[in-house]
Amino acid sequence: MKQKTGLQMSSSLPVMILLNLSGGTQDACSYFLRDHVFANAQTGNIVLMGCYLISEDLRNSIRYFLPVAFFALGVLMACLIHSRFRHTGKIHWRHLVLTLEIILLFIVGFIPGQLNWLANGLTSFACAMQVQSFRTVRGSAYASTMCIGNLRSGMDHFYKAITEKRKDELKTAAIYLTAIGSFTIGAACGHLTNHFSYRTIWISCGLLILCFLLMLIEEEDDLEAVEKKERKELKMEQKELKEEQKELQKEKAELKEEQHIIQELDEKIQHH
């Protein structure tokens, strides 16, 4: 699909909220249901992996290493999709990322507890693709699957809003606060694990499907606006062309009249 407008639909506020809700749900499901492993917060996994390594507990250190490895592979996959499909006109590459993420998380809902390492790995893989592919909201960088960066950026913009009395900085700070709030609400969905068990991750699938559809609708509206603008510009160009043709005809008429006057003067000179 063509990208002709300044603000892409993937950077809109509704899409950001849906992605953060999904990110919070993913983390809650992996932590409460899958051996207390973080799907998104790889820093926590690395800390625990290091602690178990020092304790010479190889089994548990591997348990926390695998999500980190899958996360790294997920980033590479998102980069590959972006590289291969960013110039295609049929579908936006981010739609492909969302499609793959939805499929993976849907599969995770069927994986039994005996294969928690695989479930956590696939969830981390999907999370990495999401955080790599959706990195800005209204021109500001953010993360849809973790909060520390959003908290830091939000407080930075809030400080500037207070000290410099800038409303735009306050609005940006509010966007980061919204990101953290939506992630928290998504994480609260972890309470539903008592009712739906491993299927709770499908809440994340539903949120991502809504995100996918919202991006499609906004893309269609965006293309219609672009086409309308192009038609208007074409009419303006046609109008300008007609005016130029009129000016050219007028100049030709004036030139012809001047030539006629010169011819008359030549005849008078010859006559004298």
Which stretches of residues belong to each language-model region?
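The feature captures the hydrophobic core positions of alpha-helical coiled-coils
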Residues: 234-237, 241-244, 248-251, 255-258, ...
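Alpha-helical transmembrane segments of multi-pass membrane proteins
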Residues: 2-235, 264, 270-272
